[in-house]
């Protein structure tokens, strides 16, 4: 019988794991887990696909969050109930600064809370910030891999299209409150858009948990909107190598 409402997992299945790697894509969970020692499939229900693996004999759970803050909040809450205390998000992203290239790696220190889920945990004035130890581990891991990461602020939006001011849509329209925001975030030196970090950071900070995030750039919004499969694969591999190395450091 499951020990939590949605993930269909029990504490015994996690074997004492206190660190989770949380991608958005369920298929990415398997690809990450298979780079760990003794990977074991646990369960898949809705957007949540879970694996267990080991680094230097220590268990790590890999569990997909799905897209956006609401499902991320469920994943984090239920993994915390099962004993996880550190969350490393790995994702793909669209950069908005012209000097950031496709294939680059971004480490998020804080997020603009352009979402709704984080407001269910903390008031608007509360910042969405990553844990310092997690951020440092991700940065050092990237450098150790010969990767020069960009480090900074992310916009975290509930929606992929209007919230990120995309006009390549069925209607071609963006609600006026979001018109011009892309240029505003560029002027404020924000690196990129994604959809989970604001919920992850605010929730973990409020609950006394640790969270960090690394993302691979698969498009630059100043250049193109649609990525190609080869780029996604190569960029994902770089970001995954960083998150696994960071996990090892945080467990040591």
From Swiss-Prot:
Its EC number is 2.4.2.3. Pathway: Pyrimidine metabolism; UMP biosynthesis via salvage pathway; uracil from uridine (phosphorylase route): step 1/1. The keyword Zinc does not apply. Gene3D superfamilies: Nucleoside phosphorylase domain. It is an enzyme of class 2 (transferase). It is found in: Cytoplasm. Its main location: cytoplasm. Keywords: Cytoplasm, Glycosyltransferase, Transferase. GO terms for biological process: nucleoside catabolic process; nucleotide catabolic process; UMP salvage. PROSITE patterns: PNP_UDP_1. One of its GO terms (molecular function) is uridine phosphorylase activity. It holds the Pfam family PNP_UDP_1. It catalyses: uridine + phosphate = alpha-D-ribose 1-phosphate + uracil. Disulfide bonds: none annotated. One of its GO terms (cellular component) is cytosol. PANTHER family: FI09636P-RELATED, URIDINE PHOSPHORYLASE. Belongs to the PNP/UDP phosphorylase family. Catalyzes the reversible phosphorylytic cleavage of uridine to uracil and ribose-1-phosphate. Homohexamer. This is Uridine phosphorylase. It comes from Haemophilus influenzae (strain ATCC 51907 / DSM 11121 / KW20 / Rd). The gene is udp.
